Amino acid sequence: MKRVPASDFPALRQFFGGYLHEDFVEEYGTPAVALKTFEADADEDERRRFHAEVKRFLEVTAPLDFADVLRLLSRLGSRWTPPTREALIAALTGAADR
């Protein structure tokens, strides 16, 4: 497996470190609420970069084993461990609320 550099995803690193950190459950309760809060806090350019990176992240990680994806999430600063790839996709795309 080719290692995906966390540095390729600065907007995701900012989101994970700022919203899905070790205290996110106490602060937000769920990844969906953390995402909504980020989107409310971010300006239009930050939201655009985030959504572009989410799309690229999901494309790049699609062929990877989920364990490798979880390691990448940790390197990006996430302290949330999604139970499945589908849960990760739903959380990052806001589909968890739909």
In which residue ranges do the predicted regions lie?
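Charged/polar positions within long, soluble alpha-helices
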Residues: E59-F66, D97
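Amphipathic alpha-helical interaction modules
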Residues: E22-V60
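Short terminal alpha-helical segments
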Residues: M1-K36, T93-A96
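Positions within the helices of HEAT/ARM-like alpha-solenoid repeats
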Residues: E46, D65-V69
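Amphipathic alpha-helical binding modules
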Residues: D68-R98
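Short runs of predominantly hydrophobic/aromatic residues within well-ordered alpha helices
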Residues: D8-R13, P31, R47-H51, R85, ...
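Charge-rich, solvent-exposed alpha-helical interaction surfaces
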Residues: F15, A34, E53, V69-L72, ...
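Non-catalytic all-alpha helical scaffold/repeat segments
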Residues: M1-V4, F9, R48, R56, ...
